[in-house]
């Protein structure tokens, strides 16, 4: 399993929007996502390298957690499960925990490869920059 945890200086609701609004996800993920954020909802991801992933939303509680399964569109045997957990962390801050685990043996290699992916190692910086561009105009006193 790959796990990344970061505390960001944003309210839970703003972090949730940054994780789930397709336009903002495109900024920090680098690809495009289309999804139905309901239990059992379908998703499709176009990755920055041109690859495609399909998936299904397993469970979602707005502002708290999102769990989905996804796989390369051309390899349905490489399924992994991704979970986002958002928690308040003091005044004006939120903790984000992102976990990805393989669900079938073939996915283990892909998940291990993702551990070194720049999107994981820089998630905190990239997500914060995406949040800042999107929400700076809404936040009084944010510079």
Functional labels for PLM-detected ranges:
Residues 13, 64, 126:
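Glycine-centered loop/turn positions within well-structured domains
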Residues 20-21, 30, 62, 128-133:
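Residues at helix-coil transition
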Residues 34, 44-93, 97, 101-104:
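Hydrophobic-ligand binding "helix-grip"
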Residues 1-34:
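Hydrophobic ligand-binding cavity/cleft-lining segments
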Residues 1-9, 90-97, 143:
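Aromatic-glycine hotspot motif
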Residues 16, 28, 70-71, 115-116, ...:
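Signature tryptophan residues that serve as conserved aromatic anchors
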Residues 102-143:
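A conserved amphipathic terminal alpha-helix motif
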